[in-house]
Amino acid sequence: MKKHILSLVMALTLPLNGSGITFNIEHPKKDENGNFIQGRVLLFLSNNNLDEPRFQTNDKSSTAFVFGVDLKSKNSSKTIIDSKAFGYPVKSLDQIPPGEYFIQALLHKYETFNLKTGHTVQLPMDRGEGQRWHSAPGNYYSKVKKISLDPKKRKSIKIFLDQIIPEIVPPSDTKYVKHIKIESRLLSEFWGRPMHLGAHVLLPEGFDDHPEASYPLMIFHGHFPKDFGGFRTSAPDPDLEPDYSERFQLEGYNRIVQEHEYRFYKESTSNEF
């Protein structure tokens, strides 16, 4: 497992380039604000169309193939991915089995950070998606294309990154859940740009009726949650199609989640809580 995860990380981050099967990927030079784009170009190959290839890359045996190269020139609107590009779960395009593939490419944009330490680094800034490069707003990607590939035969394929991931609509405040965003002075000084901390706050029943009251605070540090989870004010959906949780090896896990979320709401707003 550790070996697979390391290979995936290297495919997403290591700079390389190269022939056999060649993908010519065309993308914008500048973003919508007129700035030269820096980042990494990723190519995905999947043997099925159950989902877009960019969403099928993971550390499981069923993962799609992914190959990556860095953008090396600000003046170029083309990137080549060939047999020299580092990949996962195989190292090279030369190692993929011949067959039919659904292909897609994506440009993961980087920002330049002038650190307080004096160093300058290029990194992908989170844009509200929780460091999920396949869904980061502002990233360019292509439509899915089906194609026949054989690494033993020379072939050149053009891909156009003519789609852009839209901005994420922030969650709305409700009676019980509020969302706050605070600019951090220390983080902003270190990174050389405004950096913010966010929080989703679950309020107790009767909070608005007692503005003078003080309440105990419990903090849970999640992993980039987009909203407060585990809490719903509506009853579980009786028509929800049960799914299978591979992680817990459990059928109907989504139904169980909704039941517990609603139970938490009912219990936490009751007079006995």
Indicate residue ranges for each PLM-predicted region:
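Non-catalytic cap/lid and distal C-terminal segments of serine-dependent acyl enzymes
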Residues: N47-N49, F55-F273
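Exposed beta-strand and adjacent loop surfaces of beta-rich binding modules
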Residues: G20-T22, Q38-L42, E100, G198
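Hydrophobic h-region of N-terminal signal peptides that target proteins for export
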Residues: V9-G18
